[in-house]
Amino acid sequence: AAQRQPERNKIIPRYMTPAAAGYASPALGDDYEDYEVAADSEADFAVRIAGDSMEPYIHDDSIVLVKRGATIFDGDVGLFFVDGDMKCKQYCQDYLGNVYLFSLNRARRDADVTIPASSGITICCFGKVLLKGKIPLPQD
C-alpha cells in the first residue's frame, strides 16, 4: 500500500507594516513576505503586532495569524481599521449597537476605542486573530 504523504505547509502573506496594539499604524499594503504556516491553518495572512496593549495574550513584536472575512463575535480579537488607524483589539458590541475595542492589557485601557452607534464612524474588520482559546471580556 502506498504511504500517505504528510500535508505540506502552506504559504500566506506576512505584511511588513505592523498592526498597532494601541497606536496608529497604516493599513495593510503590498509590502509583504511569504510566511509558512501549517497546512490546516485557517490563516489567510500574518501581521506583526507593535505595542503592549494586548499583553499577556499577544506580545509586542509577535506575529499573529489572521482569518480574513471571519465573523467577529463578542470577545474575539480582530484587526480593525478605525478612523485611519489599524488596531489589534478585542471586540464587543452592546445591545444599543455601540462598539468597544478593548486592550487586553488593562493597564493600557487608555488605548481602548469606543464607537457610539450614533457616531457614524465606519469600522472595518480586516479579520479575526486566530488565538488558542477564548479570552474573557474585561470587567472594568
Model-derived regions, located:
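Feature for secretory/organellar precursors and membrane-associated catalytic proteins
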Residues: A24, V37-P116
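Short, positionally conserved secondary-structure boundary motifs
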Residues: A1-D60, Q93, S119-C124, L130-D140
